[in-house]
Every structure is written in C-alpha cells, then in structure tokens.
Amino acid sequence: MREIQPSRREFLVSGAAAAATTTVDAQDRQAVVATQPAQPPARRSSEPIRVLTATAFEPHELERFKSAAPNIELIVVKTPAEFRKRLPEAEVVFGTLTGADLPAATNVKWVQAGNAGVETLDREFMTSPIALTNMARTFAPAITETAMGMLLCLTRGISTHYVPQFARREMKPVGTAKSADHVELAGKTMGIVGMGGIGSTLARRAHCGFDMRVVGTDAKPMPRPDSVAELHDPSWFMTMVPQVDVLVAAAPHTPATERMFNEKVFRSMKKTAYFLALSRGMLFDDLALVRALKEGWIAGAGLDVFPVEPPPSTHPIFDCKNVVMTPHTSGYSPDRQTRLIDLDVENLRRYSIGAPLLNAVDKKAGY
C-alpha cells in the first residue's frame, strides 16, 4: 500500500477534503477510473466563467459552486424561454443541450450532464465539439447496495417466503422452509458486464463483503482490480455466462449492448443462477427473461431497470414469482446528492485552472 493522488471514486465517495489524504491500492484505483479526464479548452484565468443552469439547486449548493473559483458567475433560470435567452452568455451549462440550442450556444465549451447515461442526449449535440462530462460513479454506492439487497432477497428466500406473509397476515410454522431454497453467496461466482463505477463497486462489495469470486468484461482496456479474479474484453462474454452464479448487467446502453442479454444468454446460464439488471433496461430482452423465469432456465432476477419504464400492468413479468423489482430507484439517497455537488464543484475548480475534467464522456462511444 502506498499513498497516491485520490481517484474520482475516493473523491466522490468521501468528499474533497477526505480524499486529499486517502490511501488506496494503485491497481484498484486505476481500474475504477475507466474514462480519462477531459482537457478543457485554454482560457484566460481572469475572465468570468458564466455557468447556466435550469436545475433547481438548493441555495447552499449554489454557494458551493461559487466557491469553486473566484470568477464563477451563476445564471440560474426557471423556464426554457429564459434558458434560450441567456444561453449566448454561457460558457458552461449544468444540464443538457439540444440541436436547437446549438446556434445560440456559441460560447459554450463544456456541459456537465445531470445523469450517468447519455444515450438519450440529442444527436446533434453529441456530434458537436462541446466537451461533455456526466455523473457516472456518483450513483454506484447506492445502486450496489440495492443490488446486494435484491440478491439476498432472492438467495435467502426473503421475497418468496417471508414478504408474502404480511399479505396473508400469517407466518409459516418454524421448520417448514426448505434449506434448498436458501442459497449462500460465499464461494459463488459473480459475472459483471461493465466494470465502470457500478461494476467495480459491486465487485468490491461482493468479493470483500460476501466472499464471492468475481469475473467480468469491459469494452475498455483497464488494469484488473484486486477484487476481480478475471477481467476480459467483450468477446469473453459467452464463455463467462455458463460459469457464473450471478450475472450482472452494469454496462451503458449502446448499439453493441442493446438486448445483449437475450434468449441465448438466459438459456446458457446455470439453472441455479440469478440475473441482475442495474444500468439500463434496454440491455435485456424482457420477454426472453419472462420465459427464463417461468420455465426455470434461471433461478431468479433482480431488476431496477426495464426496457419500458414503468412496464404496463399487463406485462407478464408481474406473473413471475422469482423476481424482485424496483422502479429505477436504486441510485437514490441523500448522500448521492452530496456526491453530485462534490463532482460539480471539483470540475468547476478544474475548469477554472485548465486542469482535466473528471467523468469525461467519449461522445463517439456513447459513454
């Protein structure tokens, strides 16, 4: 172990002050930082940095933005009309831009998106030269806690045996449960697709907290974290699938990942394996998953995301007993908002001195 500069993960989880003295393993740090920081355009340090936002930040959050650098000028608007009117003044936007905004965004150099995923952003903006950063990794602590909670509900029989007792207002007699319905995670293998913020954090929690063996794939070359036994490129995906006891969708939504978890994948999984969908619903074929659950191809699924959100009440997923679902809420927590503001402030500070920005998005790759 040796002292190094804090990674974006330590910064986002602990805050700027705590991160300054953080000691972590260098290999793990590099593995989590999947995207290289973006170098902002050169600018005169004395010029005011006008930041435009329509987001309803709290007053104390706005004060933190102003504290990032002495020349920060905030332009806070409440309506789309105000946003368009003030856009020509802005150098930085906290929010999003559309193709229709671009003619007025003549001075905008950098957009800080409010979400981790950027697949829904306007195509014209995504092909523009404006730098883009996102909120990746700020959601990871909350999402991965939800993921482990879902997995425990499935493996420990909580969702199938213990939750329904409240609807019936009766508890099954002691000794009637079957040991076969209660699986232990220690020694099991988790396979993660997408070793970004969610994937790398989940790997560490599964391995260090539950003694699981973790393997994974990622489209970007990166050092293997200590918590991961094997890390390969996406070509290893179908080799990995039959090996794992838990298969996790944690990759961004791109043309390459859309519906990658399909009938072939679910049929290739162990009958005792579980599927977790954490990043984007468009990564899996929902009807194929329903068949997998109903026909026993897999043991169960935990879903925080769905292809269409929310799914209609007539969707057959609601007929499945071996599934745990949440309405895309796994990233929610008061602490998440603190991490979001920490990232905004740190990136404003970096921008003001011409330092690389954190969480840079490769617009061409889509994440």
Across the structure, where does each feature detected by a protein language model lie?
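Short, conserved loop/helix-junction motifs that constitute active-site signature segments
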Residues: 101-107, 124-128, 266-270, 292-296, ...
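C-terminal helix-to-coil terminal segments
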Residues: 33-36, 133-134, 138-146, 154, ...
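N-terminal secretory signal peptides and thylakoid transit peptides that target proteins
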Residues: 2-18
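Phosphate-binding beta-alpha-beta segment of Rossmann-like dinucleotide-binding domains, i.e.
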Residues: 130, 135-189, 201, 209
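An N-terminal-biased, well-structured beta-alpha scaffold segment characteristic
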Residues: 8, 29-132
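Glycine-rich, N-terminal phosphate-binding loop of Rossmann-like dinucleotide-binding domains
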Residues: 15, 97, 115, 249-251, ...
